[in-house]
Amino acid sequence: MLARHSPSTFHMASCRMALLLGLLLLVVASPAIADDDSGIYYQLALMWPGAYCEQTSAGCCKPTTGVSPARDFYITGFTVLNATTDAAVTGCSNKVPYDPNLNQYWSNIRCPSNNGQSSWKNAWKKAGACSGLSEKDYFETALSFRSRINPLVRLKAKGIEPDFGLYGLKAITKVFKSGINATPVIQCSKGPFDKYMLFQLYFCAAGNGTFIDCPAPQQYTCSKEILFHPFKKWMLKQQLNQDDDPFQLPGVAMDN
């Protein structure tokens, strides 16, 4: 004879199944995190290439990878920090391989033209090996964080564009505070007309992948309004053979 179950029993079983499915979806949707995430947090550094090209005397060059970098903020660092001391956790190993599939959003446009692999190797040796993540997960987590932040799209949606305009620091901060519930650290550099311009953004995430305000933010000098410098073709310095195609970013025709 089949056992009878009360409606409350079926209700409890349904709730338990819904909870398990919810947790499974959360795990699948989240970036990889370290096995022991209680004592660390992450810091992601994103550079605006227009400011870099403007301020460096060497100019910018087309990478030798054959893959054009995106017309967007580039990752320049992904650091693991001790949650107690706020010190970077570095130098754990230098023998672990790295993933070279980073050409668009962790691109190196420094001159002379290069394939970017030295910067990826340095990032892995300095910080990745200490992250508690595999080499593959370390780079994929950095790219996942960058994608979740989606800085240029968020800024443009609020009318903040790389058009030589001056934009308030508070307005830039508000874009990300309202979007990801975390305040970025803004690094400025000197640009045209002796104006400060947006150079890098730093974002922090807890060990579980949740964005947070950076616990020990670096202090940088900026003005109340900063310039958002364009990223134009004329800013790029070619150090390749003259027969090579001019620098182009995927899907976007750069203005002259």
Q: What are these language model-derived features?
A:
Residues 34-116:
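Betabetaalpha-Me/HNH-type nuclease active-site subdomain
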